């Protein structure tokens, strides 16, 4: 597996490699994330939904605290996904009380690291991935570089999007999740526990997807449909296969109605055809062990957009802070660090780069 000194994948850039540098996460307020739900909550039901603002706090740890306070099992607590530990995150949780007395959440939870913003009832548990997206406010301090070049690159991203790589969070510290995957798929002991197993399978899928996307970025066709392309409809998981590429289809892609896609590997035949499938098979030919491991684990073939559209992207250079400040929205499953890597070479003030709750 190709990686740099930090254990991360070497991936092609959508534009020129960035030369500007900055520090990320000098303080929690420098990395702010707010979850956006895709539906309204009913106000009735056995599930209590809590909107919590957490500061430098692990998502799984907080879920355990909610279970303890409510006297329920951890499985009765829902959250849409893991959020970066190092930052200020506004995140939804749900707790299935099933007739139990509701705790005084504010009294039980309020601390220097957790604030209760809203409590509301709903009829269902919050499922993983059940988000419209996330809003980000990022402050990169000690910025050094050509502001005009950075503004030009950000303008390109605002207009045309950026490669939709999985971020290094998915692969663990120094890529250690990938090392565990390789040992497992090479005949080693399977991971203990459903959580670790799911995390490693997700890392393996993400690695293979990134390999395909990087190859297409290098070929400058990551935003263009190839014959046989499985095109994902914007804002959904649905896709259709284009055996041939005509001007009408290319116009739809230019309008961002649909996007070229790459594989999330699993059982079954890839929906990609012709040139698109041939490229994916060539790129993944050296990873037969990983593909077989994912298939044996029971995962099914899925697709992910190669192109990430960054909504409401705005930026400024606050003079008093010697920094670059970014505000944008991303769909569920996309990574802010994927946007940042195209613009600035960042170093983490808190230590290891871009760590997710683990």
Swiss-Prot record:
Gene Ontology cellular component list: cytosol
Keywords attached to this entry: Isomerase, tRNA processing
Chain ranges of the TRUD domain: 161-312
Domain of life: Bacteria
Top-level EC class as recorded in UniProt: isomerase
The keyword tRNA processing is annotated on this UniProt entry: yes
Protein name, entry field: tRNA pseudouridine synthase D
Lineage: Bacteria, Pseudomonadati, Pseudomonadota, Gammaproteobacteria, Chromatiales
